[in-house]
Regions:
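Compact, glycine-rich, soluble single-domain proteins
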Residues: 1-65
């Protein structure tokens, strides 16, 4: 398990239970696939459930994959 900020662009990972509740409304669900599209200064653009979502560094650090 690691924070999303440690994932390389193009790499798919599975979201862990710890961050589930807050992120469900954005489409992040436990067991769901998240793919990092790009990362600049810790801020990330990710694909989740066929949508692109921009998330800040602080939030990305809370998403465990």
């Amino acid at each position: 398990m690691m924070p999303l900020t440690m994932v390389k662009a193009g790499e798919e990972n599975t979201i862990k239970e710890e961050t589930r509740r807050f992120l469900e409304n954005l489409g992040f669900v436990t067991g769901g696939v998240v793919t990092v599209v790009s990362e600049i200064g810790g801020n990330m653009i990710v694909n989740v459930k066929d949508s692109r979502v921009a998330i800040g560094k602080d939030m990305a650090n809370k998403i465990m994959v």
